[in-house]
Amino acid sequence: SNALDKGGENFKRLYNDSDATQRNANGQTRSGLYSLFIPMEWNYEGYIDTYGFPVFDTPEKPVEGPDGELITQGVIEYWNNEVDGLKSDQDGLNEFYRQFPRTTKHAFRDESKQSLFNLTKIYEQIDFNEDLKNSIQVTQGSFQWENGVKDTKVVFVPNKSGRFRVSWVPPVHLQNKRYLKNGTNHPGNEHCGAFGCDSYDISGTVDSRGSNGSLHGLTKFSMEDVPSNMFFLEYIARPQTAEIFFEDVLMACVFYGMPILVENNKPRLLYHFKRRGYRGYSMNRPDKKYNKLSITERELGGIPNSSEDIKQAHAAAIETYVESFVGLKESGYGDMFFQRTLEDWAKFNINNRTKHDASISSGLALMACNKHRYAPGAPRQKPVALDLGIKKYDNKGNTSKIIS
């Protein structure tokens, strides 16, 4: 099958537009076609009996195939054994899933050579989330000002058409925690986590396919009753106006009481925060000291996306998180439950970041929670001098002496 950027993405869109369960009043799907997916176990050579039926499970007695050969193993057991044998080869495993898919997720995987991150771990997490689809505690909803009065308290309202997806809500005593400093609101739970945001400035686009606004919330280790290193909020949407998006982001920050790191190449969101009295929520770029910031950066906060160093640090932050907290670990599976973000990580291209809104904002959240790593003058790990056991001698005179 083709890579997503070589026709695979178009076919995936056609397949999704042909879902027979999503039809209009005239009984038509969006494409006018019906999609059909046949898993590999239904027609895998060597595992079909003489009557043409697939041998799914390992039979108690050998089953005869159409060529007279005996079938002693079920095709599903065979497939699982192949998967187990490729666990240490992430590229080979990914290609096996693509060529012999048992789910549509397998069939529409991208080529692993295109991916910057560990695809095995990402798809392990995606498959785990798929299996637990009905039991994962991800709630869709909206944030609202209490009684509609701005700058009071924010409440979360579950709503099937809401733009937010949330997997954790702080205990009541941590909600809406903020304090005033120099006449500006500051977050009260900065020690618990942070947000990252990829914003946009223009309300509409000509083809209605402009990039989405994206927001991610991430916790960090703290002594509070808060899960550590967990993405708890995902927002990937483009409301009718940019102002709605700005207010959505502001309400999320106020509700969780956490600061936010925003790309400052599109500054309208940052101006919105400052105008509303929440400049204290907008983080300054962590890689520069305050006296080295530009006038605009001091006024608004935020971080540029044009620097190559920032791009590399951003990608490295996601890579480290995937290796440590995504997929199967010794203690079980990771608690990254947002499928759209995982899928965006899987196809992230550092040289063409425009389409990857979810990756941008999630990476900024990771940088915000680990800002000490990017601080100028942060301690660098010095290379350790190795003692090879070779001594130096002073050979002057009749007797050698050890120098070191």
Question: Whereabouts are the PLM-identified features?
Answer:
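Short alpha-helix plus adjacent loop in nuclease-associated cores
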Residues: S282-L328
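Short mixed-charge
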Residues: N16-G27, K289-K292
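RNase H-like, metal-dependent nuclease domains and their acidic two-metal-ion catalytic environment used
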Residues: S1-N10, R23-G32, Y44-R285, S324-S404
